[in-house]
Regions:
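C-terminal catalytic lobe of FAD-dependent flavoproteins
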Residues: 67-161
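Predominantly flavin-linked oxidoreductase catalytic cores and closely associated redox partners
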Residues: 1-5
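Active-site lid/adjacent beta-loop-alpha segment flanking the redox-cofactor pocket in flavoenzymes
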Residues: 10-108
């Protein structure tokens, strides 16, 4: 599993209609959560033994990026944070979906790093087609196959929010 830290911050000037936003130059992301904001960065570590938030990332990465993009965030206050695990593979941070090449009747849909809920309808449909017809019919997701991981053919996902 990959450990990610999420920070909760309060800003004097609340902007309630701001959508989930990501700064692709730094990887820092943020979104409103009630009267506060949640923010984080793509910096992560593969450490299954430590769930303590990476507080230093707030000062070094998150706050500077927020203040640069949204000047009002210069005055924000850190109100909390937590760390949790993302399900992913070490090769490229992308999901693994499809029939297992070595085991009959085993199908995989794993490693979505928090994107599973958004991708579930399409993945469900694709797997249903694969199981019932032997191939993908409406959307070809063969590039997510387990052979990609076994053959170490990475399709890197640089921004895991």
């Amino acid at each position: 599993p990959q450990k990610h830290t999420v920070f909760r911050v309060k800003c004097p000037k609340h902007i309630p209609e701001m959508p989930l936003t990501g700064d692709l130059t730094t990887g820092v992301y943020w979104r409103p959560e009630g009267k506060e904001y949640l923010a984080g960065s793509p910096k992560s570590v593969f450490d299954a033994d430590d769930l303590e938030p990476a507080w230093e990332d707030f000062e070094e990465l998150v706050w500077p990026a927020l203040a640069q993009r949204i000047p009002a965030m210069e005055e924000l206050k850190l109100t909390g944070g937590w760390a949790g695990y993302y399900d992913c593979n070490r090769l490229d941070n992308n999901a693994v979906v499809g029939k297992h090449p070595k085991f009959e009747n085993v199908y995989l849909a794993t490693g979505f790093t928090g994107r599973g809920l958004m991708q579930a309808p399409g993945i469900g449909r694709a797997l249903t087609e694969l199981i019932t017809t032997g191939s993908y019919q409406s959307i070809d997701i063969s590039n997510m196959a387990v052979e990609r991981v076994l053959g170490k053919k990475a399709r890197p996902e640089p921004y895991v929010l």
